[in-house]
């Protein structure tokens, strides 16, 4: 199922995206977000996350940097890693930069 979804996303990017133009207000683009979500979380949860993202992508959205959330197992591994450093509120802007895209 994952391969089918990735194939459909690739067909969209090659066949339809050039005609629609770059209109996504987020980074990564919605199609890249969908691909990353399916690869990170699997076809069911990845499709759900992609659908939520598509609902947030509209002309009145502020946009900006919106990465795929890490998988539950990835977050647990990072929190128990002794080499990882703790982040504070002062580090938050550096960890997630705010990118505002120009509006057409």
Curated annotation (Swiss-Prot):
Please note every region of biased composition (Low complexity).
78-98
**One Pfam family, short name please?**
YidD
Q: Which InterPro entries match?
A: Membr_insert_effic_factor_YidD
Q: Which UniProt keywords apply?
A: Cell inner membrane, Cell membrane, Membrane
Location relative to the cell: Cell inner membrane
Per the record, which residues fall in region Disordered? 71-104
Q: Write down the membrane topology.
A: Peripheral membrane protein
> A single GO CC term, please?
plasma membrane
Is Membrane tagged as a keyword?
yes
Q: Which family does it belong to?
A: Belongs to the UPF0161 family.
In terms of NCBIfam families, this protein maps to: membrane protein insertion efficiency factor YidD
Its biological purpose: Could be involved in insertion of integral membrane proteins into the membrane.
The protein in question is named Putative membrane protein insertion efficiency factor
